[in-house]
Amino acid sequence: MPQNDYIERHIKQHGKRLDHEERKRKREARESHKISERAQKLTGWKGKQFAKKRYAEKVSMRKKIKAHEQSKVKGSSKPLDTDGDALPTYLLDREQNNTAKAISSSIKQKRLEKADKFSVPLPKVRGISEEEMFKVIKTGKSRSKSWKRMITKHTFVGEGFTRRPVKMERIIRPSALRQKKANVTHPELGVTVFLPILAVKKNPQSPMYTQLGVLTKGTIIEVNVSELGMVTAGGKVVWGKYAQVTNEPDRDGCVNAVLLV
């Protein structure tokens, strides 16, 4: 019997639209405008119900904000004395470090260390327009249909990649522009090794380009570093490590990257 999970099953079998994340972001951005429009246009009983609902949402939000602000330790904390004895005058302005404050500062410090650990060589890159990224392919008997696109940049596809049927393939990734290996430079050792690419983790241009595996300047890729003999603190061999593309692959014809260590 069906268990009302047909939507999840369809997503598992066929995946999501290529522009799903972009559509979701735009839908969320439009939500505030829709709420404002409804608040202005609804009248009568519907308007009262809508206003009541919005009021309840705002009250709960204020409570959350207040609770969050109270969780932040501000002002003077407990005095230094723990035995109940009175403090001398010159010690009254001193404060004892609160546990919550210490935990908060340690979390902030860890975040800073993590950000420093994963700092990339190229923090900013030039934006690429869709006209530069995609080439319109005319199809049909009279070449009147223009719903197909061909990627003009270098891409990476996995080992088990299979093209969709030609009549259903909307975005074409040419075989001549597919890359499987990259020239990866180790910044500390100063050596460059030709390593196989495992995956494209993040393209700074768009989430859709990440899903398509487009390789542009600033893209974070995962490479197989087992040949370098790198090991963890526990003695295990490191298999994959992140690297950032530092060149324009479509101009140079190859992928150059710097290992993130």
Swiss-Prot record:
GO-annotated biological processes: maturation of 5.8S rRNA; maturation of 5.8S rRNA from tricistronic rRNA transcript (SSU-rRNA, 5.8S rRNA, LSU-rRNA); maturation of LSU-rRNA; maturation of LSU-rRNA from tricistronic rRNA transcript (SSU-rRNA, 5.8S rRNA, LSU-rRNA); ribosomal large subunit biogenesis
UniProt-listed CDD domains: NSA2
Motif interval(s): Nuclear localization signal 2: 51-58
Region (Interaction with RSA4): 85-98
Compositionally biased spans, kind Basic and acidic residues: 1-40
Pfam families (alphabetical): Ribosomal_S8e
Any one annotated GO CC term: nucleolus
Positions of short motif Nuclear localization signal 1: 15-22
Source taxon at top rank: Eukaryota
Chain residue ranges for the region called Disordered: 1-43, 61-87
UniProt entry keywords in alphabetical sequence: Nucleus, Ribosome biogenesis, rRNA processing
Compartment(s) of residence: Nucleus, Nucleolus
InterPro entries recorded: NSA2_fam, Ribosomal_Se8/biogenesis_NSA2
Family: Belongs to the eukaryotic ribosomal protein eS8 family. Ribosome biogenesis protein NSA2 subfamily.
Function summary: Involved in the biogenesis of the 60S ribosomal subunit. May play a part in the quality control of pre-60S particles. Under normal, rapid growth conditions, high levels of NSA2 would allow the progression of pre-60S particles through the ITS2 processing.
Misc: Present with 8660 molecules/cell in log phase SD medium.
Assembly mode: Component of the pre-66S ribosomal particle. Interacts with NOP7 and RRP1. Interacts with RSA4 (via WD repeats).
Protein name: Ribosome biogenesis protein NSA2
Origin species: Saccharomyces cerevisiae (strain ATCC 204508 / S288c) (Baker's yeast)
Gene that this sequence comes from: NSA2
